Amino acid sequence: MNHYLLLLFVIFLTCAGQLSQKQATHSWKENAKRQTLIWLGLSVIFLAGGMLLWLKLLQYLPLSQAYPFLSINLILVTLSGHFFFKEKVTLQHWLGIGIMMVGILLLGQGI
């Protein structure tokens, strides 16, 4: 499997796990135990899948090259929080995201 594709799967699964945890907190506030358990279960599945694929990825890429790309999760989770959960994202957040994207592009030159 292509290393980039594997890395994208890791990023997607990790992000999905974080979003599932956030959704579980909404269900928890509403005292919807069944929904909370479903979201927590999905979170565990996504995060465990991401971890297993991460271990596979580390067989092919050095940690020093692969790990910085997990910063994409910070960007995706921030954007998802803003669009799906209506969380406020300040100008400082947007500037930070821009800086991270530049850093990821610079680091990506080595892969």
Curated annotation (Swiss-Prot):
The keyword ATP-binding does not apply. Pathway: Bacterial outer membrane biogenesis; lipopolysaccharide biosynthesis. The chain crosses the membrane at residues 37-57, 65-85, 91-111. It comes from the Bacteria. The keyword Cytoplasm does not apply. Its main location: membrane. It is found in: Cell inner membrane. HAMAP family: Flippase_ArnE. Translocates 4-amino-4-deoxy-L-arabinose-phosphoundecaprenol (alpha-L-Ara4N-phosphoundecaprenol) from the cytoplasmic to the periplasmic side of the inner membrane. Belongs to the ArnE family. This is Probable 4-amino-4-deoxy-L-arabinose-phosphoundecaprenol flippase subunit ArnE. It comes from Hamiltonella defensa subsp. Acyrthosiphon pisum (strain 5AT).
